[in-house]
Amino acid sequence: MKIKFIGAAQEVTGSKHLITTDHGKKILLDCGMFQGKGLETDAANRNIMVNPEEIDYIILTHAHIDHSGLIPYFHKLGFKGEVVCTPATKDLCSIMLPDTGFIQENDMEWFNKKRRKQGLPAMQPIYTEKDARACMDLFVTVSYNRYLYLDNNIKVKFNNTGHLLGSGCAILEIDEGGKMTRIGYTGDIGREHNYLLRSPEPFPHCDYLITEATYGNRLHSDRANAEQQLLEIIYHTCVEKRGKLIIPSFAVSRTQEIVYLLNNFYSQGKLPEKIPVYVDSPLAVNATEIFRMYADLFNDDVKDMIEYNPDPFGFNSLTFVRDINQSKALNATKQPCIIISASGMMEAGRVKHHIANSIENPNNSILAIGYCAPTTLGAKLLANPKPPTVSIFGMEHSVNADIYEIDAFSGHGDYKEMINYLSCQDPSKVKKTFIVHGDPEAQQFYKRQLRKEGWDNIFIPEPGEEFELK
């Protein structure tokens, strides 16, 4: 049996890891898009290094696009197998994948206008919204902690990782000639005290382990301090300066967490009712409806709140924005307000327009609350020192607004939380551990920390590198 690391190898995005059994079955762990690589992204996503027609199963740990985003493209190229995931993951993919296809169509239309002016032929998007909807028939779901038999020799189950609604550590059990091998793939590891979701759960002992390292060299700040910092930023921006606070946020999970937190602030009287809050992202609006459907996956604090407040994602000052004209009106308003909008890395979506219209006004603030990949607008704004100007939609803008970052809202555990998550394993019995989904510096630091905890045979695969699983 072999495993080949196709994506998220010495980088964060593009998760794809191909297992080939001795019986010839091909199982792809996640099928994610590369993101945040500028002009290289499109080429990287088209160079998939595997024949989709030969893949029997895609095991999907969660719905984030850097893990799920190429499923429509693989289907377009001939993949006819099953996509196995939890029910919540399927429901989130049903809105996130078409949204990604829609964005690609719009981006390619803009790109082709430039190509036509240069006398170059038009290019096609990797896939369209229609392509994304067509692949949803391939999805097969299984609830947490229940094994699903893929065939007589292979079964899979998911243990909750607390990273995203429906996210799970995939546990594969593969029988080859009477010998059972268990492979654990963490996907993305969540926080121990998520605002909405249950904490990550232990998982069975594995012979081979594939683990992420997004924040393999970082410790998050305390969440209580982060909440106070958020309150201070809101008060300074919206009350003292009478400006706008733009919060670029991932439409799924992070937006719902921030809305839940603001709901608590308002109910506790920590924020004045007069500050309006807008969630300006159609995808976030749709995702919030799906979150409401899966209240059983919330942690005990949220469940207790629901007993007296049935909607954790609604309060008087909150408006969900779908209409594009209403979104444009937010750019024109001079009223102090909070605008939560996608995308979190500030590379696409309505938030780029809000930033372009707000960044030159010193009364305004931009607050980053999640990971921003290198080369993205978010990463450029967070650079130290702050850049004097940035390019948005091909135009230079002076960076006069205050730029803030709070990393405690991250959906990824820091290295101590990840090590604690792996404490359910006996390191001496794990034959090989593969570190993926991290920048090289984070992976190397995390590897050293694991060694201190008694882990050995740790590998950081290169893109395309293949290993025997004996």
Question: How would you name each of these model-derived features?
Answer:
Residues M1-E53, A134-R198, N325-A332, I338, ...:
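Core dinuclear metal-dependent hydrolase active-site scaffold
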Residues E11, T21-G81, C85-D137, I189-S199, ...:
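Pre-active-site segment of Zn-dependent metallo-hydrolases
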Residues L29-C31, I55-H64, I71, V83-T86, ...:
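Active-site neighborhood of phospho(di)ester-bond hydrolases with catalytic His/Asp-centered motifs
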Residues A44, D99-I103, D107-F111, N225-E227, ...:
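Short secondary-structure boundary/capping segments
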Residues T100-L164, A295-K334:
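Metallo-beta-lactamase
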Residues C169, G190-V279, S365-G370, T389-W455:
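Cap/insert and terminal regions of metallo-dependent hydrolase folds
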Residues L231-T376:
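Hard-cation-handling environments
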Residues V351, T433, I458:
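Hydrophobic, well-ordered secondary-structure elements that form the walls
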